[in-house]
Structures are given as C-alpha cells and as structure tokens.
Curated annotation (Swiss-Prot):
Residues 1-19 form the signal peptide. This is Uncharacterized protein DDB_G0282077. The lineage of its organism: Eukaryota, Amoebozoa, Evosea, Eumycetozoa, Dictyostelia. The keyword Transport does not apply. Residues 25-69, 102-142 have a biased composition (Low complexity). Residues 144-157 have a biased composition (Polar residues). Residues 24-189 are annotated as: Disordered. It comes from Dictyostelium discoideum (Social amoeba). Keywords: Signal. Disulfide bonds: none annotated.
Length: 189
C-alpha cells in the first residue's frame, strides 16, 4: 500500500510539472523574452512658489517697514532722521498713518510702489529657473526663481525707509528722511 501511494504521488508530480511546461498559465509569458520593469524612488518639491511664464514678470517685495508722506497719530517714529537696516533707499510722496502703512508712490532702489497697509509685508521663498533679462535692486530674505522666457524685474526692500513730515504725539509719524544700508538674506537669480 505504501509503495502504491508513493508511486501515485510521483506520477502526480510528474503530471503537474509536464502540464505547467506544456501549457503555461495566462499570467506567464511563454516566449523567451520576458521584460519586467520597476520604477522606484521618491520625488520631493520644496518651496513656496514655482513660476513658469512666457512674458514679463515683476516682483516687488518689502520684508521690512516703509513710512512715507505726512501723518499724525500714534504708532510711528518721532522726530529726527530715520535709518534702517537692509537694502533700499528712495523717496515717497502721499500721506499715511498707522503702523507700517505705505501710501502714494515711491521710486528708487528697493522702494515699494503702490499702496500697502500693515506692519511689514511679504517674505518667503520662490523656486524655479529664470532666463531672459533681469534687473533688480536690494536683497531679499529668500530665493527667487521662475521660468519665464521674457524679462523680469525685482525690487526688494528688506529694511526700513522713513521719509516725509509729521506732527502730533511723540509717537507720531516720522520726520526727516532716511535711507537704509546692509542686506538681509540672499537673492538667487
């Protein structure tokens, strides 16, 4: 009985091997050319912004405080001339009050154009590649990149600039003119 059982098992094993060799399953390829491809790895992207533009692009970023024009009230700088650290100097006109308010127009190296309100402005980083012509002044506390095929201009003020005249409480608006020097951070072009 044991010999018959062993013989039956051997025959069954041979039959299974023969069937697999003769009739491969659908998940296997009967041809001799097998190709297996595996893609492994990881991709990571860091940064706040990535730009890809065909045209022109301009960035104006103020990471400090800029005061221009005349104003009265509290929250400001009283008397004398103001100077700030960072890069940027210029003159402005208009009126503004409050903490870090910018009103009117400003021109110069590292100045802020347009109107902004609040203390401070924009800081952060951008990543990408820039081609074309670039012009900018000042330095930023971040890195700028993009991928435009046009022209770019960047104006960054990382310090403080005070100009204009003011009156009122000892904590009123700035009096006199001021310019900043130094730099904060790195700009990558």
């Amino acid at each position: 009985m044991n010999k018959l059982t062993i013989l039956f098992l051997i025959l069954a094993l041979i039959s299974v091997i023969y069937a697999q060799h003769k009739f491969p399953s659908s998940s296997e390829d009967s041809s001799s050319n097998d190709s297996n491809s595996q893609v492994t790895g990881s991709q990571s992207y860091s940064g706040s912004q990535s730009d890809s533009n065909s045209g022109s692009e301009s960035h104006t970023i103020n990471t400090g405080s800029s005061y221009s024009g005349s104003g009265s009230g509290s929250s400001g700088i009283s008397g004398g001339s103001g100077s700030g650290s960072g890069s940027g100097s210029g003159s402005g006109s208009g009126s503004g009050s409050g903490s870090g308010a910018v009103s009117g127009s400003q021109s110069g190296s590292g100045a802020v154009s347009g109107s902004q309100s609040g203390s401070g402005a924009v800081s952060g980083s951008q990543s990408g590649v820039q081609t074309g012509s670039q012009s900018g002044a000042g330095s930023a506390s971040g890195a700028f990149t993009g991928n435009p095929s046009g022209s770019q201009s960047q104006e960054i003020n990382t310090g403080s600039s005070y100009s204009g005249s003011g009156s009122g409480a000892p904590t009123g608006a700035a009096t006199g003119s001021g310019s900043g020097s130094g730099s904060s951070g790195t700009v990558y072009y």
